[in-house]
Structures are given as structure tokens and as C-alpha cells.
Regions:
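Short S/T/G/P-enriched beta-strand
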Residues: 214-240, 251, 300-326, 332-339, ...
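Short, hydrophobic beta-strand segments
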Residues: 272-278, 372-390
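Beta-strand-rich structural segments
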Residues: 241-245, 286, 322-340, 346, ...
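Extracellular Ig-like/FN3 beta-sandwich strand-entry sites
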Residues: 278-282, 322-324, 391-395
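Short, well-ordered beta-strand segments
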Residues: 257-259, 341-362, 372, 410-412
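Extended substrate-binding grooves/exosites of carbohydrate-active enzymes
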Residues: 1-264, 271-292
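Beta-strand-rich extracellular modules
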Residues: 288-290, 401-405
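Short aromatic-acidic-glycine turn motif
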Residues: 263-264, 306-309, 349-365, 418-423
Length: 427
């Protein structure tokens, strides 16, 4: 824990004379003098300049690099008279939207090329550039790490829906989509979750996860290619290719033919090949850093789905009634490649002293309840969450099956270490 936060999007940011922020800061300091106090201001162009920023130790600014400030707002904040002792950070940034594995998206999905933002948000690149220009700003908290239930912008069908999608889509097309959305909502909602996460609701990383990995871990050799390379309907057509890497240059190959090198320029954070004529086969990206090979990645056109693969995050489960094992289920072709477009109906079951706690697939439009063991994979992935019966021991047997793909099974050892006593903490 590094900061105490006393609020977010608080009304007092417009009225610093009310004194509530100062009072809350003093209360926190009374009990903890070791950690600074902050809050998240949703309108930093006002709150960071009107005295509210002086009521906390560290000023949190939401979307300050975008519409609520601007590309040089952090500089204005840092250089304002009286701010010499202040520090600040981006308490909410970006809010870019995407659906995992969707690039030319189906209805009510958002493209994973990571170029769609709400009108009040921005792209990750925008925040990265502002932080690079003003390194005295401490960093950022991206909205959000995970998708979450509710708030399915841009498909929330409210009065601001036409403002919620700042992509290259005309207002006429959005209006048509809104009218269609109203018809569909007579029978069911369109989405259950947000699209903001860099990780989907099932815990599977989206492409954007790797953009942040490249940014936040420059010492970690990595390269990530998007999109997948299964595009039978796009032979001879343009399919843009993006690469995220912690390297400073990348060379892209299609079926061993070089498509050229790209160099990371100041305030640029993606390597882009916007005009790639699709042909099946293999994409390969080789990243370099300081002139030396840094990382390599391959993406291949896959064959048909033939089997399932189960990957648990661990193999021993405590029987304390709370411990969980998350089993990633992927679909493979005959060569062992994951098929990124496969969406078979998958069923999970257990025998032994345990249960299926939940299943998921990361699809924001899937309304199947979490406790149901049967659901389709979404863009090649399915999740089973397994739990042991309280106080049990022995072995739990998990079976996952899909029509035409057979079944896969794993054994999970249950460890009974005795139930921990739990106490209420009091003064």
C-alpha cells in the first residue's frame, strides 16, 4: 500500500472552499503519518489549479492527458506557482475499449487493434507520451486492469451513446447501430461487462495487455503480434499487422519474406504495418534492442480444431472452502497450435470431493450464468474454476469435453491443512 485515497470523481473538486478534502486528509494523517493522501479528480483542468490540489499530498488526475487537460497539461500543473512541492499522477488513464480476439469485429464487439476510445478517454499511447514529456508525474493507473460487470461502453444505450465511440465510424452508422440496439434490447441486453480491461472478464490477456507489458517492463524481452493469422475470407486483401515490443526496432516477416524494419520513434509505442496483403502461412516478428536480437514471436495460420488442452494455474488445491484453481482450456489443431477462432460448446464436470465453482469465456456479450458448466469458447478460450469441498482431502478429477474434440482430464490433489481460524480485528 502506497497511498490512502479519500475519493474519486468528487464534487468538491469544483468547490475547494468546502474543506472536506482537507478534513479527510487530516483524519488519515491522524491514524497514519507514514503514507500520503490522494483522491482522483475527474476534471483536473479545474481541480489541479483552483486550490483543491493543495488539500491532499499527491494529486490524482483522471484523463488529464486527454479531454480533461491536454497533451501538455502535466507541464502546466508542475510549473504553476506554488506547486513546487507538489507531486501528481494519472489516477485514471486511457479507457481504451476492445474485445479479446476481435479485429474486424462482430456486432457489439470492439476491435482489438486498440484504436477505440470513448469521447472522454484516450488511447494508451496518449498517456505514455504525456508521461514521457513530464517524468515528474509519478505514473498511471489504467482504467481498467480487468473487464468488470456492467458499464458496457460503447453499447450502454444511454443518451450519450453517440459520444462513447471515438473510432473511425460515422455518426450515421452509430445512429443505425443504436436503433438496432433498441430493438434487440426488447428481448435481452447486449453486453454484461465493460470492454475497458487489458485483461478480459475470464482473466485472459487482451492484445493491449502486451502494449502495457512493453511499456512497464522495458527490461523484459518480449514481442507480441496482432492479429491472429486465420483469415480465409481475406486472401489478397489488406490485414494490418501491429507489433508490441520492449525492443527498439522490429522486423516483420510473412512466409520468410521481410516486410521491412520499423524503428521506435519518440512518442511512438507501436510498430505498425498498416498495409499487409493477407496470405496464409506464418508471421514472424524479430525484435532488437541496442542493435542486438531481443525477442522473437511467430503467429501461424492454423488447421482445423482437433482437441482440447487443459492448463491449470496450479495442481494442488487447499480444502479451506476458499482456494480455487483456474483451468485455461484452449483448442488445438493437429500440429498443436492454438486455434484462435474456435468456439465449440464446452462442458466441464468433476468427480471427487469438489465442484465447478464457475466457468467463463471472456465474451462480454455472453449472458450464460457463471455457475453453468456448459458454455462456448470465445475466440479459442474457455475457463473452468474448480473448488474443493470444505475439509476434504484426496483427489479431484476434472473432465472437460466438446463435441468432435473428445475430452481431456486432469487430476487435482486436495490438501487438507486444517481450517484456519479467522478473527475480527478490533481496537
Amino acid at each position: 500500500m502506497i497511498l490512502w485515497n479519500t475519493g474519486n470523481e468528487v464534487s468538491e473538486q469544483y468547490h475547494p472552499e468546502l474543506g472536506i478534502a482537507r478534513h479527510l486528509t487530516e483524519v488519515v494523517h491522524r491514524y497514519d503519518k507514514t503514507r500520503p493522501v490522494t483522491f482522483g479528480a475527474s476534471y483536473p483542468s479545474k481541480s489541479a489549479m483552483n486550490g483543491t490540489e493543495l488539500q491532499v499530498d499527491v494529486h490524482g488526475m483522471n484523463y488529464a492527458a486527454g479531454v480533461y487537460g491536454g497533451p501538455d497539461f502535466y507541464g502546466e500543473f508542475l510549473n504553476k506557482e506554488g506547486h513546487e512541492h507538489l507531486s501528481g499522477f494519472s489516477s485514471e488513464s486511457s479507457s481504451t475499449m476492445s474485445s479479446r480476439g476481435e479485429y474486424f469485429p462482430r456486432k457489439f464487439h470492439v476491435s482489438s487493434y486498440d484504436l477505440n476510445e470513448p469521447g472522454w478517454g484516450g488511447l494508451p499511447d496518449q498517456e505514455f507520451a504525456a508521461l514521457d514529456r513530464y517524468p515528474a508525474i509519478c505514473g498511471e493507473f489504467v482504467w481498467t486492469g480487468f473487464d468488470y460487470l456492467g458499464e458496457p461502453t460503447p453499447f450502454n444505450s444511454d443518451k450519450t451513446v453517440l459520444l462513447n465511440h471515438a473510432a473511425a465510424v460515422s455518426k450515421e452508422e452509430l445512429k443505425k447501430q443504436e436503433e438496432e440496439l433498441k430493438k434487440i434490447e426488447q428481448n435481452r441486453p447486449t453486453s454484461r461487462s465493460s470492454y475497458f480491461g487489458i485483461v478480459d472478464l475470464a482473466g485472459f490477456p487482451k492484445d493491449r495487455y502486451y502494449l502495457y507489458q512493453a511499456r512497464w517492463r522495458p527490461d523484459y524481452p518480449m514481442v507480441h503480434i496482432l492479429p491472429h493469422w486465420n483469415w480465409e475470407d481475406k486472401n489478397g486483401k489488406n490485414v494490418p499487422v501491429f507489433v508490441y515490443s520492449s525492443g527498439d526496432e522490429v522486423e516483420l516477416f510473412l512466409n520468410d519474406r521481410s516486410l521491412g524494419k520499423k524503428f521506435k520513434q519518440p512518442y511512438e509505442y507501436r510498430f505498425r504495418w498498416d498495409s499487409v496483403c493477407y496470405e496464409s502461412g506464418e508471421l514472424k516478428a524479430i525484435a532488437y534492442k541496442d542493435g542486438k536480437k531481443w525477442a522473437e514471436k511467430h503467429v501461424r495460420t492454423t488447421g482445423k480444431s482437433v482437441k482440447l488442452k487443459l492448463t491449470p494455474d496450479k495442481t494442488v488445491l487447499k480444502s479451506d472452502g476458499e482456494d480455487l484453481i483456474f483451468v485455461r482450456v484452449s483448442i488445438l489443431d493437429a500440429d498443436g497450435n492454438e486455434v484462435p477462432t474456435a468456439e465449440p460448446l464446452i462442458t466441464s464436470s468433476v468427480s471427487g470431493p469438489g465442484m465447478i465453482a464457475a466457468t467463463d469465456n471472456g465474451d462480454p456479450t455472453c449472458l450464460i450464468p457463471f455457475h453453468e458448466p456448459k458454455r462456448p469458447a470465445f475466440n479459442g478460450l474457455y475457463l473452468a474454476i474448480v473448488k474443493a469441498r470444505r475439509g476434504s482431502e484426496g483427489t479431484l478429477h476434472l473432465c472437460v469435453e466438446a463435441d468432435g474434440l473428445g475430452k481431456e482430464e486432469i487430476d487435482i490433489r486436495i490438501q487438507n491443512e486444517g481450517l484456519e481460524k479467522r478473527y475480527l480485528l478490533t481496537d
